[in-house]
């Protein structure tokens, strides 16, 4: 004869089930994020971090893992780092990046350095938040072609990720907002500030005569005339300009975003820091070498390019007309902007 379970037996079974569920969801950790600050040289501007996404040790660690995570792509073949390689100052050595389906992107992958001071992202400034910008490559069918929901389904039972998300954000049910915040935190720690030129400014290094001549040319209206757009410690004024690349441009650039005719064919002024490592150059990666870039500004500017920036003061004569010696000197100075400590920093390397 079957005996009905007693109330005590039912209670015991219920407790066992509850404990089993708890163990399944248990995170062997605690939510105690540790604030992280970045040590900056005295001559760098203060970083204003978003109020809703302050730097923490746990958030940066999670972001580093996600930056290198191939599961963020539809076929698990590429990560953010696939198009932003450390040895290339976290840019792509190809003119246009290749997505998981073999499709080419439309613009060159930008360098990831000193993003903590940027207010606009992508070549056309289509996003004013680093967090929002990070959402896009994962979803873009020509790039990673994945959905954030698929990614979180895939890592649902990954105890390492469960622990890291909990330690960073105090949740066992993370979503894309948590992920992009973590990646943004990681990217904001990627500060380049220890080139030879930085050391020179701090009195820790001496420039050679050729490098000094290049620096003078860089800052001279009658020389390279580079300082208008690339002066300052960041190597960019963070503005959008048309530098006269084409007589008849194809890509409308900033104008696509603002829908203002005056912004057509303008692109974000890239930083010249680590320019030695970040070839190819320009928004479409048209120049393969630094020499080609210097030659362009010397003799290759198209003066009739629509909306050419007025700061390109020598456009009417095709450029600043540097002679071979002056070009060599300018290049020597630009190479002092290389920061090997940045590209070799193990804090940015693959954690897997």
Please provide the spans of the model-predicted regions:
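Short amphipathic alpha-helical interaction segments
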Residues: 264, 282, 318-326
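Short alpha-helix boundary/capping motifs
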Residues: 91, 140, 158, 193-194, ...
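C-terminal soluble interaction/assembly domains
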Residues: 306-318, 322
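Post-cleavage N-terminal segment of exported redox proteins
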Residues: 2-60, 136, 145-212, 216, ...
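Mobile amphipathic helical/loop "lid" adjacent to a hydrophobic cofactor/ligand pocket
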Residues: 130, 141-146
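Short glycine/threonine-rich turn/loop motifs
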Residues: 26-136, 198-309, 343-352
